[in-house]
Structures are given as C-alpha cells and as structure tokens.
Design a protein with these regions (language model features):
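Flexible, acidic/Gly-rich N-terminal and inter-domain linker regions that tether
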Residues: 1-78
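Conserved Radical SAM active-site core
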Residues: 47-131
Length: 131
C-alpha cells in the first residue's frame, strides 16, 4: 500500500470525528463542567474558548522528559514540538501557565494556521507534536 492510501484513511477518520463532534460546539459538553455554551455563536464558557482555538505560542520545547524532547537519547535533540493553547476549564490554584490558562493570552487561529504551526515544527525537526 502506498503513502496516499494511509493519508486518505487518516483524513477520512478525521472527517468522521469532526462530524460526530460538531454538535458539541453549539451545546458544549466537552469537559466535565458541561457549560452548554454555544461556541459557534461566539459565546465562551468557563474555558473562554470560542469557535476557534487560541494559541499563545508554538515552539520547540526542551523542558519535557528526555524521552519526549530527545535530550540524551540516541543522539536525538529535536525537541518536542509544543503548541501552547490559551484558555482552560480547570482553574487550578497553582497553575504554572496562569497567563495562558486563566487570562486566555493567545491569538485566535484558523484550522489552516494550526496545521501550518504543526508542519513548521515538523520541518524544524520536532520529535513529536505536543498540544
């Protein structure tokens, strides 16, 4: 089987998942808070996330465990391709990413922009994509 066969199967699986998940965007219950907000209409719930992802930054991250970031293992030092999203529903008191999670510091990105971040990280040698 060729590479295109697998790419097509993955794309079909993604489209199927999006079809199944799309009703939740207008009656959000994706997290345990079940806020039922209509994100499609531009409203936001506890997580402050609307109809688009908000990204704070996208970079190669070397602060993860060596098995993820590649440090010290078989000569791989590519880093973990990390995309930091803004907004969170947990509201942990000792959150290490308070500015991103609680203050929602980030920029709305389209699906295409998010995909381009991932491709750029891959081109930079990321060993994985860490969301």
């Amino acid at each position: 089987m060729n590479k295109n066969f697998f790419v097509e199967r993955k794309l079909e699986a993604v489209e199927k998942a999006l079809t199944r998940l799309s009703p939740f965007a207008s009656n959000c219950c994706l997290c345990p808070r079940h806020c039922r907000v209509d994100r499609i209409s531009g409203h936001t719930g506890i997580c402050q996330t609307g109809d688009q992802a908000r990204v704070s930054t996208s970079l190669l991250h070397f602060g993860e465990e060596p098995v993820l970031s590649g440090q010290g293992g078989a000569g791989k030092v590519g880093g973990s391709g990390t995309i930091f999203f803004a907004g969170c529903n947990l509201k942990c008191l000792f959150c290490q990413n308070y500015q991103l999670s609680w203050l929602n510091q980030g920029h709305p990105v389209s699906d295409e922009q998010l995909a381009s971040f991932m491709l750029k990280l891959q081109a930079q040698g990321a060993l994985n994509i860490n969301l």
